[in-house]
C-alpha cells in the first residue's frame, strides 16, 4: 500500500548518501555535430540507481516517509470524517504509525548530522567535508529554525491526535512541509553538492554545475509567477471538498458532495 512512499523516501535519501554515476560535459561538444542525442551522465553500475535500496540510511528515510504518509492520512480522516467509530480507528492507527516513524526519522537525522558531505569551493572543486550537514545547520540558522519548527509541529500533531483533537492534520501537514523544505535546503545550499557521486567525486551535482541556461532560468522565473494562482486553486478545491465532513453514508454511496 505504501510502496511508492517507501521508494520516494529512499530516492530522496540519495541526495545525502550519493549514487554511482559520472558526468562528462565534454560529450556536449563531441556530440554536437553527430545529430544524435548527447548523453553527458551515465550510471556506473548495471543497477541504474536501484542499489540505493541496499543502503540502510536510504531505507530508514524511506520507511520514515512511508509511516509519515500513513500517519497524515489518519489525521486527515480524523479531521474530515463525521463518524465516531471511524475516528477512533483512525486515531489508534495514527498512534501505531507514529512510533516507527519517529524511530526511523531520528535514525536518519542523527546519522545525517554526524556524516560527511561534499563541499564545493569558489573554483568549483568538490571535496569531502566532515560534519558538512551539521555545519550547514549551524551556518544557516534560518534553515535550522525551519527544521525545528517543522519537527515540533509534527510532534504536536501526534500529541494532538493522541488527545483526540480533530485539527491534528493541520500541524502535521505544515510541519511536514517545513521539515522537508529544510532538509532539501540543507542538501543543496551553503556550497553543498546536493547529489554526491560515489563513482567520481567531481561528477557530483551542485546548484552551480547543474543549473540550466540563462534563457531557461528566465522562462522558469516567469512561469513561477503563476504559483500563487495554482496555490489559490488548490486552496479552493480543498475547501470545496472539505466544506462538509464526510459521513458513513457518503462513503457507501457513489455521489460526490462537492
Enumerate the language-model features and the residues they cover:
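Conserved small/polar residues in nucleotide/adenosyl-binding loops
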Residues: 1-5
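Hard-cation-handling environments
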Residues: 99-106, 112, 116, 140-143, ...
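Hydrophobic alpha-helical transmembrane segments
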Residues: 40-68, 134-151, 210-230
Amino acid at each position: 500500500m505504501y510502496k511508492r512512499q517507501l521508494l520516494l523516501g529512499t530516492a530522496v535519501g540519495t541526495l545525502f548518501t550519493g549514487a554511482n554515476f559520472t558526468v562528462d560535459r565534454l560529450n556536449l561538444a563531441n556530440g554536437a555535430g553527430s545529430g544524435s542525442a548527447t548523453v553527458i551522465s551515465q550510471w556506473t553500475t548495471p543497477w541504474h540507481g536501484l542499489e540505493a535500496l541496499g543502503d540502510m540510511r536510504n531505507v530508514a528515510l524511506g520507511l520514515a516517509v512511508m509511516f509519515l504518509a500513513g500517519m497524515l492520512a489518519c489525521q486527515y480522516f480524523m479531521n474530515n470524517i463525521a463518524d465516531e467509530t471511524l475516528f477512533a480507528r483512525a486515531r489508534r492507527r495514527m498512534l501505531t504509525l507514529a512510533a516507527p516513524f519517529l524511530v526511523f526519522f531520528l535514525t536518519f537525522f542523527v546519522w545525517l548530522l554526524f556524516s560527511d558531505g561534499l563541499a564545493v569551493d569558489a573554483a568549483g572543486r568538490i571535496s569531502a567535508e566532515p560534519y558538512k550537514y551539521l555545519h550547514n545547520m549551524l551556518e544557516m540558522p534560518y534553515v535550522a529554525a525551519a527544521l525545528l519548527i517543522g519537527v515540533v509541529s509534527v510532534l504536536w500533531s501526534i500529541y494532538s491526535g493522541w488527545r483526540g483533537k480533530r485539527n491534528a492534520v493541520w500541524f502535521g501537514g505544515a510541519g511536514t512541509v517545513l521539515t522537508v523544505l529544510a532538509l532539501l535546503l540543507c542538501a543543496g545550499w551553503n556550497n553543498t553538492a546536493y547529489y554526491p557521486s560515489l563513482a567520481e567525486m567531481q561528477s557530483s551535482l551542485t546548484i552551480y554545475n547543474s543549473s540550466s541556461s540563462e534563457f531557461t532560468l528566465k522562462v522558469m522565473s516567469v512561469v513561477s509567477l503563476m504559483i500563487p494562482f495554482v496555490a489559490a486553486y488548490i486552496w479552493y478545491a480543498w475547501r470545496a471538498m472539505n466544506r462538509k465532513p464526510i459521513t458513513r453514508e457518503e462513503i457507501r454511496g457513489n455521489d460526490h458532495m462537492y
